């Protein structure tokens, strides 16, 4: 967290308390992890859960009962777009949970997730569409059952640890 924001946290918490808004935090976890835990808990209780977030990483939480509302500004007007399981599947051709796998390969500089050098968003999506997960991708490579070639294969093989670390870093915890 940037120092400027950290300095403001006590004031923000005071304002939230004054508005009778609950504050939930847990040492060692990010807000996304708490959000993921609460969303999945609500879903298990039979609730329809809506998350309003500008962070597309939350798409991995989308399901038939969890909707992610993403604000976007178009022609000076802010609107929200809803993403549930069906919308993620339609837009990415992947199940929401597979977006973690995509991030493991492509990385995300804004979240300090390294990914695999040379793998961009389109390649990451197509690899996960074909191999379903990072684990399965590497299993196919080890069994020589993949169709990767050249520099791409070299990068993926050489950066297995980085891909696995990136997957861990990109996954929102749901049991905090």
Segments (PLM) and residue ranges:
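Extended two-metal-dependent nuclease catalytic cores across DNA- and RNA-processing enzymes
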Residues: 2-176
